[in-house]
Every structure is written in structure tokens, then in C-alpha cells.
UniProtKB/Swiss-Prot annotation:
It holds the Pfam family DUF3461. It comes from Photorhabdus laumondii subsp. laumondii (strain DSM 15139 / CIP 105565 / TT01). Belongs to the UPF0325 family. InterPro entries: UPF0325. NCBIfam families: PRK13677.1 (NF010213). It comes from the Bacteria. This is UPF0325 protein plu0668.
């Protein structure tokens, strides 16, 4: 699992926190950030540079002939797919945690309102 990341020398893909991807000239720069250990100020990161692939394709108009385009490196595409699996899995866990906390806060609110309603009913009974 995560063969492309392991081929980059990343032995523990589960330690990946996030990644960024940017383009500089004819290269794509991938930066992978790992989870911080307790007491660390900065997360450890590694950077990889991938040259963009050049392709010659036919232009829209028959008059123009061919044009050259640059696109993302195929290997980088596979690495990003694996990174998305890791980072989205973490996001799903975070979203689930937020949902559970939201449900818990809502339940607290409902119970507090019900207790107040019952106490008000008791108060009415004791006044009579």
C-alpha cells in the first residue's frame, strides 16, 4: 500500500499530515508535511521537484496545426492520489468528531430545556 510514496523514501505514510503543490517555471513542487511531535514548533517536511511533461497536440483550428502544452508528471499524479487517500481519511475522521460533538451539544441543549420544562411544571403544582 502507498507504493509511490514509499518509492520516494517515505517509510511511514501514516505520519503524513498534509501536502502542498505549486508550480514554478516548468516544474511542479510537492511539499509533504508530517505530524508534529509534542514540543516541536515546526512540522518536519520534505520537498520534491517534478518536471512538467511537454506534449504536442493538434490545435482547435486546422490552420494553426499543433501546439505544445505542459501537464503534470504521471508519477506525481499517482503520488497525489495516494496523498489524497491519506489526507481525506484524516478529514473524514475530523468531520466525524465534529459531528459527534455537535450532536452532543444539541443533546445537552434539549435535555436542559426539558429539565427546565419539568421544573416549571413542578413549580406550578407546588403553588396550588
Amino acid at each position: 500500500m502507498y507504493d509511490n510514496l514509499k518509492s520516494l523514501g517515505i517509510t511511514y505514510p501514516e505520519e503524513i499530515d498534509r501536502y502542498s503543490l505549486r508550480q514554478e517555471a516548468n516544474n511542479d513542487i510537492l511539499k509533504i508535511y508530517f505530524r508534529k511531535d509534542k514540543g516541536e514548533f515546526f512540522a518536519k517536511s520534505v520537498k520534491f521537484k517534478y518536471p512538467r511533461q511537454r506534449k504536442t497536440v493538434t490545435a482547435n483550428n486546422a490552420e494553426q496545426g499543433y501546439k505544445e502544452i505542459n501537464e503534470i508528471n504521471t508519477n506525481l499524479r499517482y503520488v497525489i492520489e495516494e496523498l489524497d487517500q491519506i489526507c481525506k481519511r484524516d478529514q473524514v475522521e475530523i468531520d466525524l468528531k465534529h459531528k459527534i460533538l455537535d450532536d452532543l451539544r444539541h443533546l445537552e441543549h434539549v435535555v436542559a430545556n426539558k429539565i427546565a420544562e419539568i421544573e416549571a411544571d413542578l413549580e406550578k403544582l407546588t403553588r396550588k
